[in-house]
């Protein structure tokens, strides 16, 4: 019984976390396929887009650590 409750709470937490961290929580999961198709057509697209969207050193990065220009995050970009 306890394990079932823990599993239900965990699934609810992870579902909420997915929508909280999405760029646009109302359509966060809807826009995944068009981006994937664009990246399949041009494999270099994610690398090119990352340069424009990366955070400067000192910016807060705990929620989305992949956006640091230096790719090193410990509460802030280094």
UniProtKB/Swiss-Prot annotation:
Keywords: Cleavage on pair of basic residues, Disulfide bond, Hydroxylation, Ion channel impairing toxin, Knottin, Neurotoxin, Presynaptic neurotoxin, Secreted, Signal, Toxin, Voltage-gated sodium channel impairing toxin. One of its GO terms (molecular function) is sodium channel inhibitor activity. The presence of a 'disulfide through disulfide knot' structurally defines this protein as a knottin. The cysteine framework is VI/VII (C-C-CC-C-C). Pfam families: Conotoxin (PF02950). The keyword Disulfide bond applies. Residues 23-49 form a propeptide. Expressed by the venom duct. Residues 1-22 form the signal peptide. GO terms for cellular component: extracellular region; host cell presynaptic membrane. This is Delta-conotoxin BuVIA. It comes from Conus bullatus (Bubble cone). It comes from the Eukaryota. The modification 4-hydroxyproline is found at residues 57, 65. Delta-conotoxins bind to site 6 of voltage-gated sodium channels (Nav) and inhibit the inactivation process. Belongs to the conotoxin O1 superfamily. Disulfide bonds join 54-69, 61-73, 68-77. It is found in: Secreted.
């Amino acid at each position: 019984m306890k394990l079932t409750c823990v599993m239900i709470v965990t699934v609810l937490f992870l579902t909420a976390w997915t929508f909280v961290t999405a760029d646009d929580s109302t359509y966060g999961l809807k826009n995944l396929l068009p981006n994937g198709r664009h990246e399949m057509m041009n494999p270099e697209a994610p690398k090119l887009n990352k340069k424009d969207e990366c955070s400067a050193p000192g910016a807060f990065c705990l929620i989305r650590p992949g956006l640091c220009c230096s790719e090193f995050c410990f509460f802030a970009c280094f």
